[in-house]
Amino acid sequence: MCVYKTYKGKLKITSIPARADRPRLPFPLNFLIHKRKLYLIDTIAEVQRCADCGSYFKQTHTCSTRRRDFYFHHINTQSSDWWEEIKFFPLGAHPDTRRLFVVYDVETYTWHGSFGKQLMPFMLVFTLFGDAQLCEQAVNIAKKQKWSSWPKQANTFYYLNPQRNKVGSLFKQYRDALQEAASTLLWRQFLADNPCLENLCLKLGYVHASDIPFEELCTLELKGQPTFLEVYVVGHNINGFDEIVLAAQVINNKQGIPAAFKVSRNFMPRCGKILFNDLTFALPNPTHAARKDFKDWEEGTPTSADYKFQFVKFMVRDTFALTHTSLRNAAAAYALPVEKGCCPYKAVNEFYMLGTYRTDADSFPQRDYWSSDEEYLLNKSLWLQENSGAYDIVQRTLDYCAMDVLVTAELVKKLQASYLDFVHTSVGLPHCNFNVLQRPTISSNSHAIFRQVVYRSQRPNRSSLGNFLLAPSNEMYDYVRESIRGGRCYPTYIGVLTEAIYVYDICGMYASALTHPFPAGKPLNPFDRALAIKNWQDRLTQLHRPIDYFDRTLLPAIFTIDADPPPEAFLDVIPPFCSRKGGRLCWTNETLRGEVVTCLDAITLHNRGWRVQILNDPRTTVFPQWECLARDYVQLNIAAKERADKEKNQTLRSIAKLLSNALYGSFATKLDNRVTVFSDQMEDKYVRGISDGTYDIKSTAFVETDNLSSSVMAELKITYSPVKQQTDATRKHRQCTPTSNSSSDEDAPFYTLGDPQNHHVTYTYKPITFLEADDSALCLHTLQKKSSLIFNNRYPSHIASFVLAWTRAFVSEWADILYLEDRGTPLEDRILKFVYGDTDSMFLTQRGKELMDTRGKHRLKGNNRPLVFDPTNPQLTWLVECETQCPRCHGDAHSQESVFLAPKLYALKNIYCPSCRAESSGKLRAKGHATSQLSYDLLVTCYYSTEQLGDEKFGTSRLSLRRSLVSRQTHQQPFTVTETTLARTLRPWKDRTLRAIDRHRLAPYSNSHPNPRNKELCWMEMY
């Protein structure tokens, strides 16, 4: 007899042996215990399990596509977490949100501290605008704290103090007071709507209603309409400078906030800048409810019920992250009514360091303090016209700083109004209350607009983009990231070239690529995936039959391949693919093994004569359909750009260009498992993660205490009496003596100072610094998940991979234009046509230009040729234009002589037009170098000196600001900005990623000339 018992999805079998004293039954007796019930089993049969849908069957089985998909995406333990739905929230903000803007700027001088030359603020100016009530409160706080009013503009204040920490300390007090005032305003409104809290707090054992914990408030039945307050601290380039310099003074952000608020902070340092530094003080929203009708969301308009909390938000925003240009250029690009002034920074720095600065005969700062003769003469003439007496450098610096603040304030207003108009008219969301400052960067704004456009077109009727567009996660995230290949940048010629060089550039390469089809929908299950891969392999096996990029019978896919190149005489100096197998990204003609590619790359390789074999990989992904996901988004930007050109609206043109270029970058955002938190603001999930081993503390750093707000007790001297211990008899005698007061002089005899050499002891206490922050507020932890897998529900990273694959298809077609006639001729015997290439540009010789004018004529910009992919007439859509144009006749021009030393290190001597014989200055690029110290002749001299084995050393140096936010290096302190001298050596390319054909020409690695860095072994099975 057997007893079967089910437990947690498993079957446990217990055999009960037959007893000898009882007769045997003629049939087996089997029981099943399931859910506390006993069943008698009639028959038992062996079954099989379907690997595709998880069903059990005896002999034959037919599973549906729907069941296979569900099992693959939701049940299978290996693949169920590979793809996540992308969360969505409407683009706009709540229409009743009240906002206050604090726009500020600081001026600094150099201070030599323990960690090098640090920049210390001595002046801060800010201006206020926004909601009338909030603005009035902010002005009153400024006056109460004795900020000085700038007489030339209302609601503008400043503070001037060269002593260290004074400026930051006062600004900290002001921001703390703003936080307290705004949170108090929200709490009073919340309490007015819920007066029952006053009585409830006493029943719960609290003194004040504000002492009721946030978690307790969430369980109560609350009333009233939510209040949304936002305070923006804004500046230009403050995330890379001002906020770091002042951060030590403003890190204590919970001061004076009642326990009823839920306080959360989003702090993210990246690349030496503060990407996010947002604080939220939240209370429950009584009107919150789950949404059932999503029509409002399609229009980008959230309602009060969509917000789980009502809040006060404090956000730091950098206008540089929204404009990607200097304040002076932004003022011109956005047609602001005010202009940025000029300031002799070095003179100001010397004045505060040395107490003086050098002047000319008119007591005006000398010429070398100004950036150019023009700037020097203009500012001097303006000063002389004012006839305001002696030059007051402090007052001039104050006026300059205040004007910067006013320019930034006007820029903020212009950005808000212009982006709102863009969303209403160009995007077609007239009811959307869009606030560009709600998100910190142009990339995050472009991605939000893209998601809104997709949501409107697809109508998923849920709080995500649905299955139409998913995000790769965990194992699949790493697999997709392997298929993302960077750009191309290398010279195929080293040295001085006396031939004519034309520079051609792809027009809006990423924008054009984004209009092409991309994968959409939920990836196929393994069974259907195998059928699709079989179809791909059958087509790739037909070597002499080109594959159309837009063949709809071939589904979009990402897979692992091996690829073998054609004979070397049929290869080009522009390979179709690149590899990281050697440790560095290298464009190579070598055999490819185990490369993760998109199906577009497989087509590109196949059409260039490569033999492609798809490998069996469980992570292989096939999507059900092609869709032009971003075409509408790019089209509306192009339409806005054309409208701006017609209306001569520079602001609209700048917005459209920025949004168009930023979308690809948002797709390619790389996530990691690290997070930086302050010790006193560590959320519960991180505390639990550290305790259960999910997170590790990778590093801990402390903010430099020299920069902190503090109070100092000066040096203190105390003299102590060296009186010897009294005898017991003396003590007894004094105890018997009547006293009128227990605190008489007998208990503590007055000490009279005697001989300082013999009769006293003096202790000298060093100055004591009392910091205005707890130790936990100074400590930063960098936490990292122990698991290397990355959860992603934000970015469809595979779209970035396909964008780059489309650009490689563009360049491959460009290579066919240049080198189709040379196929079959060894590389060493070919005519020089191409000498340098960036991701979207090529430097061509005269022969290369002739081919572009003949075979590539259809790819030249002009004659209304399209830049946007047309789904009704599918073909690769890209155009190029000659960048070296004559400034006089606007015809194609060339450089008569050029020098190429290394990637991103070259110079064109001049730009000469053969039509009108006009000549203009050339072009010099030297990444990492101070280009003001370089010239064409210097690069030529450097090349010849190196070739002739000369001893002369060439280099450049420049002052650089080293920003440290969170550092694991002992010589770098968190939240400091130090000034360093960056020296770079100037020399020809040493560590090349190409092989040499002769003294000048280079070619990609191939099987006959393999990459010496590639030490990776590949497992191959021979049959």
From Swiss-Prot:
EC number: 2.7.7.7
Any one of the GO CC terms: host cell nucleus
Subcellular location: Host nucleus
Any GO molecular function: DNA binding
Transmembrane residue ranges: none
Main enzyme class: transferase
The keyword DNA-binding is assigned to this record: yes
Catalytic activity: DNA(n) + a 2'-deoxyribonucleoside 5'-triphosphate = DNA(n+1) + diphosphate
Sequence segments annotated as region (Disordered): 726-751
Main location group: host cell
Additional note from the record: This DNA polymerase requires a protein as a primer.
Quaternary organization: Heterodimer with the terminal protein; this heterodimer binds to bp 9 to 18 of the genome. Forms a complex with viral pTP, DBP and hosts NFIA and POU2F1/OCT1 for initiation of replication.
Family: Belongs to the DNA polymerase type-B family.
Role played: Eukaryotic-type DNA polymerase involved in viral genomic replication. DNA synthesis is protein primed, and acts in a strand displacement replication. Assembles in complex with viral pTP, DBP, host NFIA and host POU2F1/OCT1 on viral origin of replication. The polymerase covalently transfers dCMP onto pTP, thereby initiating complementary strand synthesis.
Protein name (database record): DNA polymerase
Organism: Bovine adenovirus B serotype 3
